[in-house]
């Protein structure tokens, strides 16, 4: 009994340590991004998904399918994170749009995996939350089209997947006693808010408002990933820790 109890306490300590490191990396990423500290921002942002992956690999309760899916999703997000880090010397608007398309393509893979896992976990879109998500994305699409003169097919396709994941997450049934699953709706909402601000920052915001918007993008992104990965991992576990 002592050995089992000691093992459980060690798991809890490790889990808390990993969460603390991720939280620090998220704060540093957000502040560095808002303040224009590009090198610090690049290093800390590149560490976010690997930190989540460490926790996933250490979680022996995860099913092989769940582990593989979440590693694939966070791996795609890591590629997207690297692509979306702005170059230190600045870039043209056209180059920024190309970078946005590449990032959207990588994150589309993640959203597809998340949506599939949510459906498997019993999530279903609800009319009210779906209407809110759809209205938000349609408004952003209209803004983007007005600025770019025609819809961007890559960004539009990503927006559809993002909206699907967001609506599913907001429709996730509650699980009594499981806080991680209960945070899935918050993760979906945060992801939509984060990506909405990316487009607003590109099309509308300038100066200090753009910097503040960038900080908002990063903090909501870090929270969204934490909540979604934790929640989806909870839906994919086979057995409790012994």
Task: List the predicted regions and their residue ranges.
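Short amphipathic, positively biased membrane-proximal segments
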Residues: 1-242
